[in-house]
Amino acid sequence: MREPEDELATLHQEGLLRSLRSGLSSDQLLSTSDGLPVVNFSSNDYLGLSRDEALVNAACEATGRYGTGAGASRLISGSLLPHRDLEERIAEWKGTEAALTFANGYATAMGALGAFLTSGDVVIMDKLCHACLIDGARRSGATLRIFPHNNLDKLENLLGHYRKKISENSRLLVVTESVFSMDGDRAPLAEIVDLVEKYDALLLLDEAHAVGILGSGGQGLAEELGLQDRIALQMGTLGKAVGSAGGYLAASRAWINLLTNKARPFIYSTAPPPAQAAASLCGIDIIASSRGVELRDRLWSNISRLSELLGKQPASAIIPVILGDNEMALRASATLLEKGYLAPAIRFPTVPRGSARLRITLSAGHREEAVVGLHQSLLNVS
């Protein structure tokens, strides 16, 4: 029988062993467990809302009124007013008839793909989609096909092949992200939507890293391109730019009713705490307000500045510095930490083998001197 120590030793030899880093706050200026001040360039709190006074107050007020937990699953007695209010707000914000929230983004993907797909269906997915989407597709029982990253020709070939092959009642689903989590680049969304419509398929778009950052009201890339009405299933997270926790799917009333009845992570989990829902609602309201515009402007100023310094085209708040070798990425991360910058090494299986990197993420909370200082330190490690 395999012993856990043997597996851990193998991970260590391959430079893939991970451990938890304790003693950190989620603010942009934080302390390591050794008490050394560092600037966080690894957080997905893109607008700095997770410590915003308004969100904290909303969470505290909801806790005082509803308690610390929901006490049951949503379909039993755990569906509280903050959950309803949040879902109605998400639907309004995303331009859909309805929305359903989950405890986190992983549960959202597992629930949606498991609810909507079964044996006989086909799901076609971008190679760089997040693990939650891949896992959800694999567990659904549907046929999973992967197309090379953002390769429209291969996508069309697969759509054409399976549209002819599957039965009339089977579903043909395309899955992609608007902003990819490890590379920070965008999907050619308009072209993908055209192909989905051409072959009478469905599109599930994960906007996890676009919500709050793109779009006139922070709704994401679909809204920025005027495509919301043409996308059946819009998925997102509440734990990144929104500043809280959880995930959601926004769609037609029929899709959401089906999800409510068939999504196992939703049915068999205690509802998220009411404080989480209240903070999420507050975060969305801020993102959609004039203050949200100001925060996005500050964020994009930081994105543009670091992109310019690194000679890259600004696309999102995620800027990878690809080093290739695991040990090289670990050493680079350790060197940056010594200089006061937190940018953990990202390695396989999060990214493909041979593409270990520093995944730099920017926030509206970063000051320009920190961005410039990070760049100077990167010159010595990359």
Predicted regions and their residues:
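Conserved PLP-binding catalytic core of the aspartate aminotransferase-like
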Residues: 293-340, 350, 354-355, 362-364
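Conserved N-terminal alpha-helix of the aminotransferase class I/II PLP-enzyme fold
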Residues: 57, 61-104
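PLP-dependent aminotransferase class I/II
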Residues: 235-237, 241-313
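PLP-dependent enzyme catalytic core of the Aspartate aminotransferase-like
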Residues: 53, 57, 61, 65, ...
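Active-site phosphate-binding strand-loop segment of PLP-dependent enzymes
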Residues: 45, 145, 149-205
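Conserved active-site segment immediately N-terminal to the catalytic lysine
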Residues: 200, 219-238, 256-261
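N-terminal "arm"/small-domain region of PLP-dependent enzymes with the aminotransferase-like
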Residues: 2-68, 201
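Conserved PLP-anchoring active-site segment centered on the Schiff-base-forming lysine
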Residues: 112-131, 302
